[in-house]
Amino acid sequence: MTRIRRGYIARRRRTKIRLFASTFRGAHSRLTRTIIQQKMRALASSHRDRGRQKRNFRRLWITRINAAIREIGVSYSYSRSIKDLYKSQLLLNRKILAQIAISNTNCLYMISKEIIKFK
Protein backbone atom coordinates (compact mmCIF):
# COMPACT_ATOMS: atom_id res chain seq x y z
CA MET A 1 0.00 0.00 0.00
CA THR A 2 1.41 3.37 -0.94
CA ARG A 3 1.84 6.15 1.57
CA ILE A 4 -0.58 9.04 1.28
CA ARG A 5 0.73 12.45 2.23
CA ARG A 6 -1.42 14.49 4.58
CA GLY A 7 -3.08 17.66 3.40
CA TYR A 8 -2.10 21.16 4.38
CA ILE A 9 -5.30 22.18 6.18
CA ALA A 10 -4.22 21.31 9.73
CA ARG A 11 -0.78 22.83 9.18
CA ARG A 12 -2.35 26.01 7.82
CA ARG A 13 -4.61 26.22 10.88
CA ARG A 14 -1.65 25.80 13.23
CA THR A 15 0.46 28.39 11.45
CA LYS A 16 -2.44 30.85 11.64
CA ILE A 17 -2.66 30.24 15.40
CA ARG A 18 1.14 30.61 15.71
CA LEU A 19 0.99 33.96 13.93
CA PHE A 20 -1.53 35.15 16.52
CA ALA A 21 0.74 34.03 19.37
CA SER A 22 4.03 35.15 17.84
CA THR A 23 4.49 37.88 20.46
CA PHE A 24 3.85 35.57 23.40
CA ARG A 25 6.82 34.41 25.50
CA GLY A 26 8.27 30.93 25.90
CA ALA A 27 6.18 27.85 25.22
CA HIS A 28 3.12 30.05 24.78
CA SER A 29 4.41 30.91 21.31
CA ARG A 30 5.82 27.49 20.35
CA LEU A 31 3.59 24.64 21.53
CA THR A 32 0.25 24.25 19.81
CA ARG A 33 -1.80 23.25 22.84
CA THR A 34 -0.53 26.05 25.03
CA ILE A 35 -0.89 28.51 22.13
CA ILE A 36 -4.57 27.60 21.82
CA GLN A 37 -5.10 27.96 25.58
CA GLN A 38 -3.31 31.31 25.69
CA LYS A 39 -5.25 32.54 22.66
CA MET A 40 -8.55 31.74 24.37
CA ARG A 41 -7.33 33.44 27.53
CA ALA A 42 -6.10 36.52 25.65
CA LEU A 43 -9.37 36.92 23.75
CA ALA A 44 -11.38 36.54 26.96
CA SER A 45 -9.20 39.12 28.70
CA SER A 46 -9.50 41.60 25.84
CA HIS A 47 -13.29 41.20 25.81
CA ARG A 48 -13.50 41.71 29.57
CA ASP A 49 -11.09 44.63 29.64
CA ARG A 50 -12.90 46.57 26.91
CA GLY A 51 -15.81 47.03 29.31
CA ARG A 52 -13.42 47.68 32.19
CA GLN A 53 -11.64 50.36 30.14
CA LYS A 54 -14.91 52.19 29.55
CA ARG A 55 -15.60 52.19 33.30
CA ASN A 56 -12.09 53.35 34.16
CA PHE A 57 -12.16 56.23 31.70
CA ARG A 58 -15.56 57.35 32.96
CA ARG A 59 -14.19 57.36 36.53
CA LEU A 60 -11.16 59.35 35.39
CA TRP A 61 -13.33 61.94 33.61
CA ILE A 62 -15.57 62.33 36.66
CA THR A 63 -12.54 62.76 38.94
CA ARG A 64 -11.04 65.42 36.67
CA ILE A 65 -14.31 67.34 36.38
CA ASN A 66 -14.89 67.16 40.14
CA ALA A 67 -11.37 68.46 40.89
CA ALA A 68 -11.72 71.35 38.45
CA ILE A 69 -15.19 72.32 39.67
CA ARG A 70 -14.20 72.24 43.35
CA GLU A 71 -11.45 74.75 42.54
CA ILE A 72 -14.10 77.12 41.19
CA GLY A 73 -16.42 77.01 44.18
CA VAL A 74 -16.05 75.40 47.59
CA SER A 75 -19.71 74.52 48.02
CA TYR A 76 -20.13 73.42 44.40
CA SER A 77 -19.61 69.75 43.52
CA TYR A 78 -19.62 67.43 40.52
CA SER A 79 -23.10 66.04 41.14
CA ARG A 80 -24.66 69.49 41.46
CA SER A 81 -22.96 70.71 38.31
CA ILE A 82 -24.11 67.69 36.26
CA LYS A 83 -27.66 68.14 37.57
CA ASP A 84 -27.61 71.82 36.63
CA LEU A 85 -26.06 70.97 33.27
CA TYR A 86 -29.01 68.72 32.44
CA LYS A 87 -31.47 71.34 33.69
CA SER A 88 -29.99 73.99 31.42
CA GLN A 89 -30.06 71.47 28.52
CA LEU A 90 -26.41 71.88 27.58
CA LEU A 91 -25.20 68.96 25.51
CA LEU A 92 -21.73 68.37 26.95
CA ASN A 93 -20.73 64.86 27.91
CA ARG A 94 -18.23 63.93 30.62
CA LYS A 95 -15.39 63.29 28.18
CA ILE A 96 -15.63 66.76 26.64
CA LEU A 97 -16.01 68.40 30.06
CA ALA A 98 -12.88 66.61 31.30
CA GLN A 99 -10.91 67.77 28.26
CA ILE A 100 -12.10 71.33 28.85
CA ALA A 101 -11.15 71.05 32.53
CA ILE A 102 -7.59 70.03 31.63
CA SER A 103 -6.91 72.27 28.66
CA ASN A 104 -8.96 75.41 29.33
CA THR A 105 -10.08 75.97 32.92
CA ASN A 106 -11.36 79.48 32.13
CA CYS A 107 -13.85 77.99 29.68
CA LEU A 108 -15.05 75.54 32.35
CA TYR A 109 -15.35 78.44 34.77
CA MET A 110 -17.56 80.32 32.29
CA ILE A 111 -19.70 77.22 31.65
CA SER A 112 -20.23 76.68 35.37
CA LYS A 113 -21.17 80.35 35.86
CA GLU A 114 -23.76 80.03 33.07
CA ILE A 115 -25.16 76.89 34.68
CA ILE A 116 -25.37 78.54 38.10
CA LYS A 117 -27.00 81.62 36.56
CA PHE A 118 -29.59 79.43 34.80
CA LYS A 119 -30.66 77.87 38.12
Curated annotation (Swiss-Prot):
Q: Where in the cell is it found?
A: Plastid, Chloroplast
What Pfam family is a match, any one? Ribosomal_L20
Q: Name one GO molecular function term.
A: structural constituent of ribosome
Q: Which GO terms describe its cellular component?
A: chloroplast; ribonucleoprotein complex; ribosome
GO BP terms: namely: ribosomal large subunit assembly; translation
InterPro entries found in the cross-reference section: Ribosomal_bL20 (IPR005813), RIBOSOMAL_L20_CS (IPR049946), Ribosomal_protein_bL20_C (IPR035566)
Q: Write out the entry's keywords from A to Z.
A: Chloroplast, Plastid, Ribonucleoprotein, Ribosomal protein, RNA-binding, rRNA-binding
Major location, coarse class?
A: plastid
Q: Which family does it belong to?
A: Belongs to the bacterial ribosomal protein bL20 family.
Which function does this protein serve? Answer: Binds directly to 23S ribosomal RNA and is necessary for the in vitro assembly process of the 50S ribosomal subunit. It is not involved in the protein synthesizing functions of that subunit.
Q: What is the protein's given name?
A: Large ribosomal subunit protein bL20c
Q: Which organism was this protein described from?
A: Nandina domestica (Heavenly bamboo)
Q: What is the lineage of its organism?
A: Eukaryota, Viridiplantae, Streptophyta, Embryophyta, Tracheophyta
